[in-house]
UniProtKB/Swiss-Prot annotation:
The gene is egsA. This is Glycerol-1-phosphate dehydrogenase [NAD(P)+]. Pathway: Membrane lipid metabolism; glycerophospholipid metabolism. It comes from Haloarcula marismortui (strain ATCC 43049 / DSM 3752 / JCM 8966 / VKM B-1809) (Halobacterium marismortui). GO terms for biological process: glycerophospholipid metabolic process; phospholipid biosynthetic process. Its cofactor is Zn(2+).
């Protein structure tokens, strides 16, 4: 008897391009959201775009409220929940990078309210996915939530963000290639459910970004266009799979372990990018495609070595040998690799 079923939750509106921040009201109106809007941002994004979003709602006769959060934490999520309850918010808008959007996403999910994502930096695929990431102590928690009802990504705003945030977003996408390989491996060895559609979309997105790496340059709005479209595709792949598997494999375990060992280390995207160089080597050996990943990262100015991450060699090896302990997710790391094997992988690929 056939009993398969799936429920794919996707954004209804994805508005990307030059000056689209000015279309926020139009995009929200099409969603038929009612009630008082709550705009959530962090300090810099509040100045860059949050004030403009609030002003748009005021001009249209809404009574918007706003809250500026200082850090990504479960306490901040609760602050947003409490504020939204106090003002009887009808829907939430997250304006910013990963911090504000993840917190808004999780708060909206807890409240059962609609959520609109307004990224000010193309730094990771959380701008469209149904997962939030929040640190707690030396651990970073990945929490399931509803994806945004709409994404409004103004490439003019994104192009003004610090370039390192854009290169982190690129690296996050490039790492999808090894994430999919890990997913396929888990399917073959552990019978983990694998979605051909989600896997193909994620892999294609990574490959297209690698091919476009030479065109991604600082100061070009076109670069933001390329990167944000890739981030949207990656988020959609996760929604189709109802899992972070299409975009999170051993390279993400490596990054999360680095977060534990070096809490104020490099950007998430940069860490997974370096991780993907080594995990691709583990998948395909010395003649594999790890050079393609490394060269693409180098072309956009993203780190490819421990030194460029600002992390010492010993910590990289420790993270690689213990990354499998982060969560119960089968990857090429299996039940752990020896220190000798980790040193070889990091040395051959030039990471250390």
């Amino acid at each position: 008897m056939f009993e398969k079923r799936t429920w794919i939750r996707l954004p209804r509106n994805v508005v990307v391009g030059h000056g689209v921040l000015g279309q926020t009201i139009e995009a929200v109106s099409e969603l038929h959201l009612t009630g008082r809007p709550l705009v959530v941002s962090s300090p810099t994004p509040h100045d860059v775009a949050g004030k403009q979003v609030v002003a748009q709602f005021e001009d249209e006769g809404y009574d918007p409220s706003e809250i500026v959060i200082e850090e990504a934490s479960f306490d901040a999520v609760q602050q947003v929940i409490d504020h939204a309850s106090d003002i009887d918010a009808g829907f939430l808008l997250g304006v910013g990078g990963g911090k504000a959007i993840d917190i808004t996403k999780m708060a909206a999910d807890d409240l059962g309210l609609g959520f609109v994502s307004v990224p000010t930096a193309a730094s990771h695929d959380g701008i469209v996915s149904g997962r939030g990431s929040v640190p707690e102590g030396d651990t970073r928690h990945s929490v399931a939530a509803e994806p945004p009802l709409a994404v409004i990504a103004d490439t003019e705003v994104l192009a003004e963000a610090p370039w390192r945030l854009t290169t982190a977003g690129c690296a996050d996408i490039i790492s999808n290639y090894t994430a999919v390989r890990d997913w396929q491996l888990a399917h073959r060895l552990k019978n983990v459910h694998y979605s051909e559609y989600a896997g193909a979309l994620s892999q294609m997105t990574a490959e297209m970004l690698v091919e476009s790496a030479d065109s991604i340059k600082q100061g070009l709005e076109e670069s933001s266009w390329i990167v944000v479209k890739a981030l949207v595709s990656s988020g959609v792949a996760m929604s189709i799979a109802d899992s972070s598997r299409p975009a999170s494999g051993a390279e993400h375990l490596f990054s999360h372990q680095l977060d534990r060992l070096v809490p104020d280390g490099a950007l998430h995207g940069h860490q997974v990018g370096v991780g993907s160089i080594m995990t691709e080597y583990l998948h395909s050996g010395q003649k594999g495609k790890w050079r393609d990943a490394r060269d693409a990262l180098a072309a956009i100015g993203a780190p490819t070595t421990a030194d460029e991450l600002g992390i010492d060699d010993e910590t990289v090896i420790e993270a690689l040998t213990t990354a499998h302990q982060i969560r119960d997710r089968y990857t090429v790391l299996g039940d752990g690799m020896s220190e000798e094997a980790a040193i070889e992988a990091a040395t051959v690929t030039g990471v250390i």
